[in-house]
């Protein structure tokens, strides 16, 4: 979700940075919709992050070019942050046809499910699948 993207952009040499790199040029296929892209854009352009429109635009263009766009069906779900619901909805929609994970730095914000994982857990899953 958004915190992984922000963490990656603030510190590329990090586990979230590795996740983003794998999403841009590796085995991770981002699952998005336009609401998620707009959330990324709004958050990344906050002045405190010091990211330019060009940097954010290029990043989102690159993510979009590798992504699967899923039309999320609304779920009756209450989460601590209402803006997180769309990430869960898109994940659930894509899970109907593919093995899909929701990667977040805030596990406590989502239902406890085997497919809701931290960036570290996602890296472990990828490494184990490559063996």
Question: Which residue stretches match the model-derived regions?
Answer:
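PIN/NYN-family metal-dependent endoribonuclease catalytic core
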Residues: 15-45
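A secondary-structure boundary/capping signal
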Residues: 1-2, 32-33, 106
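Metal-dependent nucleic-acid phosphoesterase active-site entry motif
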Residues: 1-13
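Acidic, PIN/NYN-like endoribonuclease modules and their adjacent C-terminal/linker elements
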Residues: 96-131
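Membrane interface segments of multi-pass transport proteins and intramembrane proteases
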Residues: 49-50
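Alpha-helix capping/helix-boundary segments
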Residues: 4-5, 36, 87, 108-109
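Active-site neighborhoods of divalent-metal-dependent phosphate/nucleic-acid chemistry enzymes
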Residues: 59-105
């Amino acid at each position: 979700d958004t915190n992984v993207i922000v963490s990656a952009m603030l510190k590329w040499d990090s586990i979230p940075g590795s996740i983003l790199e794998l999403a841009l040029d590796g085995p991770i296929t981002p699952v998005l919709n336009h609401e998620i892209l707009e959330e990324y854009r709004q958050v990344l352009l906050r002045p405190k992050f010091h990211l330019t429109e060009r940097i954010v635009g290029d990043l989102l263009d690159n993510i979009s070019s590798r992504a699967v766009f899923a039309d999320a069906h609304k779920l009756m779900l209450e989460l601590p942050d209402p803006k997180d619901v769309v990430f869960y909805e898109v994940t659930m929609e894509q899970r109907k046809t593919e093995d899909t994970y929701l990667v977040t730095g805030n596990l406590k914000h989502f239902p406890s499910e085997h497919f809701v994982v931290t960036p570290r857990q996602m890296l472990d899953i990828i490494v184990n699948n490559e063996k």
